[in-house]
């Protein structure tokens, strides 16, 4: 799922994409005796599984900087963060076989007298790193932050962990199916090509890329930290990871916050399918905003006129790629790429995001008329990242999703869904229903996780979330009767706590993290005026 903002990426996690307690808080003392007792309990929990050496390891905490050019590492060092690698098996069915490392970071509790325990972070994606996140999360937690060891980790094959390189020449495989059958056929070839590259470069590890294995890694991290239980803050996809952990390791979790949550049934290779209505509604709301600023952006003086502008841009890109930028910063955008930009750019309803998106659409509108355009540094960087910015991590998101659930294999299945979706959702339908890269990768080794155990947790959701829909958060809440739902009414936003600036949401989450007590009933906050 798409994370939403650059701030999201640094603070708690595109992906645009939080946590639960079943028992009172962990003992606050950090004495040697307490640590030894916890380590002994951890060792017993892993006894006989062949995993003892992983659970019994102790991180070698040290500097986060990996060299003179590691700016992020230096910033973490300055913030008092320590970093380490945790050893985990590549294949949990063969714990004596090949090993990989998972990078972790720690901002230690400073209020040791009232220490609660360790809280792990996941920023969504899937494939989002979190080693960089503890300083920002400490600020978000306000007075509660100093009571936790805040633990960031880069999931297996992400960021500073043992990498997985799919050899992709692009930053993401998310595209629209376009306006024609020919465009769709190009997408079929594009996705098959990406799958073939990933299999050729990383085929030996692909069977071990999955959320269930990441959850197993989380439990090893818990053991390595010497904790009986862990707390957790997970955004977007991180909510799915958190849910999976509670199902696989009951009794090992404390305070879990799942923000921008998704029900397990809605997660998988077609994870945007079902969000068409919310994304089109978000576009419509933005169009009404832009219409009031026609003098600034020139996109139309009514909501309908602005939406017509979007349709004309897509139609023009179908006739021939739009040229945006100049010189070395020139990009060609066709009808499979432009709709994706409409969805990715309209990530929330803050004035800053709406203005930035309006500026981007203005550029595309000029290009659709054949006029020269100039890109802002931010838009140019976003285009480069998505369209040409291949990196070792580019294929990790797809690899994880494909390792979690099987996808339909027949391209006709997707084409029929695309055609059915066009009338009601002309922009989002062909994006949400487009063929998945997973259609060309092997079937996952394990069955998808089912919610069979109740779990106490706080689920946070906005009614207009365009990524993981409010309906999906409600479904997860219903599957976990002991959970409580914190709703933000009136917001078109994915991921809220500490990121959206809603005091009501932030204070209620922090109260839960501080006390370990869920509210007696579901609670509702209201969007603050801009």
Regions inferred by a protein language model and the residue ranges of each:
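Catalytic-loop region of hydrolases
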Residues: 2-15, 27-181, 304-307, 437-443, ...
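Alpha/beta-hydrolase fold active-site neighborhood
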Residues: 49-54, 308-455, 498-500
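Active-site-proximal cap/loop segments of hydrolase catalytic domains
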Residues: 163, 169-224
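A catalytic-pocket lid/entrance helix-loop region that shapes and gates access to the active site
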Residues: 166-177, 244-309, 342-345, 359-370
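Alpha/beta-hydrolase fold nucleophile elbow
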Residues: 227-236
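Conserved strand-to-loop "acid loop" that flanks and positions the catalytic carboxylate
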Residues: 459-464
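Conserved alpha/beta-hydrolase "acid-adjacent" motif
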Residues: 466-471
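Catalytic histidine-centered segment of alpha/beta-hydrolase-like enzymes
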Residues: 492-503
């Amino acid at each position: 799922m798409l994370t939403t903002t650059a701030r999201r990426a640094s603070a708690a996690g595109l992906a645009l994409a939080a946590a639960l307690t079943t028992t009172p808080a962990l003992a606050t003392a950090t004495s040697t005796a307490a640590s030894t007792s916890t380590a002994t309990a951890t060792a017993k929990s892993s006894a006989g599984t062949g995993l003892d050496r992983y659970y019994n390891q102790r991180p070698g905490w040290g500097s986060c900087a990996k060299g003179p050019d590691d700016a992020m590492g230096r910033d973490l060092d300055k913030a008092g963060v320590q970093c380490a690698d945790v050893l985990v098996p590549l294949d949990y069915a063969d714990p004596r076989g090949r090993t990989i490392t998972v990078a972790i970071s720690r901002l230690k509790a400073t209020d040791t007298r009232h220490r609660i325990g360790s809280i792990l972070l996941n920023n969504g994606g899937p494939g989002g790193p979190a080693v960089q996140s503890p300083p920002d999360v400490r600020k978000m937690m306000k007075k509660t932050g100093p009571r936790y060891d805040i633990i960031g980790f880069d999931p297996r094959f992400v960021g500073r962990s043992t990498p997985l390189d799919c050899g992709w020449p692009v930053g993401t495989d998310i595209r629209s199916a376009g306006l024609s059958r020919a465009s769709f056929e190009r997408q079929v070839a594009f996705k098959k090509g990406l799958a073939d590259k990933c299999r050729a470069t990383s085929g030996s590890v692909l069977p071990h890329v999955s959320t269930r294995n990441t959850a197993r890694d989380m439990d090893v991290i818990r053991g390595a930290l010497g904790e009986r239980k862990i707390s957790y803050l997970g955004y977007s996809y991180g909510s799915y990871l958190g849910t999976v952990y509670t199902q696989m390791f009951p009794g090992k979790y404390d305070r879990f916050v799942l923000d921008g949550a998704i029900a397990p049934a809605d997660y998988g290779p077609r994870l945007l399918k079902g969000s068409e209505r919310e994304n089109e509604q978000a576009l419509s709301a933005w169009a009404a905003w832009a219409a009031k600023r026609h003098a600034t952006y020139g996109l139309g003086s009514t909501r309908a006129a602005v939406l017509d502008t979007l349709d004309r841009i897509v139609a023009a890109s179908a006739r021939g790629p739009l040229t945006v930028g100049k010189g070395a910063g020139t990009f060609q955008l066709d009808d499979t790429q432009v709709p994706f930009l409409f969805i990715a750019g309209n990530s929330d309803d803050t004035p800053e995001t709406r203005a930035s998106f309006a500026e981007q659409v203005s550029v595309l509108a000029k290009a659709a008329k054949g006029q020269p355009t100039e890109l802002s540094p931010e838009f140019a960087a976003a285009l480069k990242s998505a369209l040409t910015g291949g990196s070792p991590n580019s294929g990790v998101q797809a690899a994880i999703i494909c390792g979690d659930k099987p996808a339909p294999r027949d391209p006709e299945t997707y084409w029929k869904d695309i055609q059915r979706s066009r009338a009601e959702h002309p922009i989002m339908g062909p994006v949400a229903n487009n063929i998945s890269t997973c259609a060309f990768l092997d079937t996952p080794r394990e069955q998808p996780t089912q919610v069979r155990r109740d779990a106490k947790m706080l689920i946070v959701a906005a009614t207009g979330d365009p990524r993981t829909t409010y309906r999906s958060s409600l479904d997860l809440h219903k599957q976990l009767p002991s959970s409580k739902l914190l709703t933000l009414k009136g917001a078109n936003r994915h991921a809220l706590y500490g990121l959206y600036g809603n005091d009501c949401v932030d204070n209620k989450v922090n109260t839960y993290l501080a006390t370990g007590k869920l509210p007696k009933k579901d609670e509702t906050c209201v969007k603050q005026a801009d």
